[in-house]
Amino acid sequence: MIKKFDKKDEESGSGSNPFQHLEKSAVLQEARIFNETPINPRRCLHILTKILYLLNQGEHFGTMEATEAFFAMTRLFQSNDQTLRRMCYLTIKEMATISEDVIIVTSSLTKDMTGKEDVYRGPAIRALCRITDGTMLQAVERYMKQAIVDKVSSVASSALVSSLHMMKISYDVVKRWINEAQEAASSDNIMVQYHALGVLYHLRKNDRLAVSKMLNKFTKSGLKSQFAYCMLIRIASRLLKESEDGHESPLFDFIESCLRNKHEMVIYEAASAIIHLPNCTARELAPAVSVLQLFCSSPKPALRYAAVRTLNKVAMKHPSAVTACNLDLENLITDSNRSIATLAITTLLKTGSESSVDRLMKQISSFVSEISDEFKVVVVQAISALCHKYPRKHSVMMTFLSNMLRDDGGFEYKKAIVDCIISIVEENPESKEAGLAHLCEFIEDCEHTVLATKILHLLGKEGPRTPVPSKYIRFIFNRVVLENEAVRAAAVSALAKFGAQNESLLPSILVLLQRCMMDTDDEVRDRATFYLNVLQQRQMALNATYIFNGLTVSIPGMEKALHQYTLEPSEKPFDMKSIPLAMAPVFEQKSEITLVTPKPEKLAPSRQDIFQEQLAAIPEFMNLGPLFKSSEPVQLTEAETEYFVRCVKHMFTDHIVFQFDCTNTLNDQLLEKVTVQMEPSDSYEVLCCIPAPSLPYNQPGICYTLVRLPDEDPTAVAGTFSCTMKFTVRDCDPNTGVPDEDGYDDEYVLEDLEVTVSDHIQKILKPNFAAAWEEVGDAFEKEETFALSSTKTLEEAVNNIITFLGMQPCERSDKVPENKNSHSLYLAGVYRGGYDLLVRSRLALADGVTMQVTVRSKERTPVDVILASVG
């Protein structure tokens, strides 16, 4: 009885998988049966299945043991059992990369590939191409060409799919099969036509003109395969995204015509392609949306799901285009498939009116606990978008989100809710206290370190400015008592911010920080000691520098500079100005990296760090000092011209390095000694040009021009440069790429390049602008008033000022409240050379906009530059 029970228990539990407890050594021992005569197909099949199972489970096979098993398996070709033979093909494909001398089966596979048994031919082709390398491919080329045009569809498809894989090994050989692939593309079999189109596209994808011709041919002649139509639509949409013709192109007409295809798959692919095209207008979207609207009432759940998911994406950018589908979407709210119902509601949240929000939120509440975390995140994202659209509904959203926060769920789900509440708190001052209260409640029982530290950071930033800041201290100090080291350290930093901004709370905060100095963790003790000493000085400037605003430098850059400093001992103190500035605030960099991977990882170098390293490797630029700022690329040629050139401006303390990324788009020319000659205006001085040695067809190259900034007038920071690309041309054969021996000099005029005031200023966020304003002081303060007569709204004025100066808006002052006639804009940045620069701009709307600008810095030059450029 006991034995019977054990067996039954084993079958119902983990023992239900017959291969679960396989041992590699035992299976390899069993494989010796392959050498027995006569062959037992049933037993051999079972052993091959075990080998494939082990390989797919990630079991490591040594080269010797894999080769031994492989050679034993080759004897099974003597059997005529169909199932066993096809299992051999599978095993060959799996063991091709781990066994030696696999080419021993080439003759057997070639025999099967050209034999009369159609059931063997397709799998034999796939197995043969898996073991073939570039040197052997020519030996089977004749057979492959025949197979591609074979009348048996499974053989032709196998040959075409294998050709796609062989392109990675020997593109030139496969290119010779293009005529056969074109013949296969006219096949009546839907899969053969689809695979043939795939081969033709991949052979031509680097030649835009050839792809366009292919598309033109197939769109005119038509196709039998719905799969091939889907692929054509994808190719056409890819070309459309790169094209300048946009939606006037015949390609767009082709995609639109596919909306009337008889196959639902093709109709959906066309609708999806139109929706994902950039810069689509509501009128161009209308036919695609109409098709998706019909799919919403389809009896097939897959079609309903596809339609509502795609409409959900459209609603993000074009909510008005989806409004016509609202009735159909409302019918889907009660769909038996919860995924469809969720997407329907979230789409309605994006397209519905303010009055429908309460009703929709009530409907979501009824089933939100039944859906997966993935769809809960979609709901939260929709609510977040709704908060931006209808800020007055924040209280309804906040209540709903706080209830969701209490439910069970994974990290991504909780993170989405926390991010949404944080954005509501930051966008709506009246919701601040309610949002902070919900987050305080959440961190009392939060198992995610990343979220706890993020919330503590927010409490430190927003809590001190609330009417009763003391009520948050208990929640923060509880973290010091109850949590892990990372959360305790974040809590100490948050406490310090309360002490720095609230004089009445300072004595209590000092006591709490003294307790934190007894912590078991070094980081927590160090932070507590540091903040305690700073706060005891009771100086606003110190608080601003070391508590509110923190580091504004690149972390990888600082790590490298400190390492270099330790390698070369010096009596001079370490200079923080030698480190490139961070492109984003340090805390944002940190949180983003941490959210991606919970494990501590090294910060990835930023774009600016990479540029710094590249420029430092060039001898002429070694002594320019730290890279201050790199601009976004500026295009200096039209897209379809002979040469494509764009420029990145690298700003140093006293110099600018212009980096020209050049591409030669002519296949009958090789350019050599490529430089860009610059004629500056005013007092800029061109020091040297570093050429790109050669520019072969379609291969990008880089040349540089070094320019010294004006000495006499430091405020003359803006200027225009005329640019001419000079080079030596060597004509070459377009087919072989071999250039002529002799060349001739030529030049190409580029568009003018402007250096603006924003190129000299790096954005830096000051979380507490008032403290930073006091810290900089009024030693070099200047104030002027300007009339912006051509500007009609405060929003336009704010956007123009931010864009022109290239500075970072602080305290969310880039958002202008509704129905206001005046507004204050706070901007922060660092001027070239490492000088903090703050701008306070008071705007008033009357006949145009009047602007009073106050500028502060610790040096005179940045202040003069700002006022001179604005004036």
Curated annotation (Swiss-Prot):
Residues 1-20 are annotated as: Disordered. The modification Phosphothreonine is found at T594. Its main location: cytoplasm. One of its GO terms (cellular component) is Golgi membrane. The keyword Membrane applies. GO terms for molecular function: structural molecule activity. HEAT repeats lie at residues 64-101, 283-320, 321-355, 356-392, 395-430, 467-504. Residues 1-11 have a biased composition (Basic and acidic residues). It is found in: Cytoplasm, Cytosol; Golgi apparatus membrane; Cytoplasmic vesicle, COPI-coated vesicle membrane. Keywords: Cytoplasm, Cytoplasmic vesicle, ER-Golgi transport, Golgi apparatus, Membrane, Phosphoprotein, Protein transport, Repeat, Transport. It comes from the Eukaryota. It is a peripheral membrane protein. GO terms for biological process: intra-Golgi vesicle-mediated transport; intracellular protein transport. Belongs to the COPG family. The coatomer is a cytosolic protein complex that binds to dilysine motifs and reversibly associates with Golgi non-clathrin-coated vesicles, which further mediate biosynthetic protein transport from the ER, via the Golgi up to the trans Golgi network. Coatomer complex is required for budding from Golgi membranes, and is essential for the retrograde Golgi-to-ER transport of dilysine-tagged proteins. Oligomeric complex. Binds to CDC42. Interacts with JAGN1. Interacts with TMED10 (via cytoplasmic domain). This is Coatomer subunit gamma-2. It comes from Mus musculus.
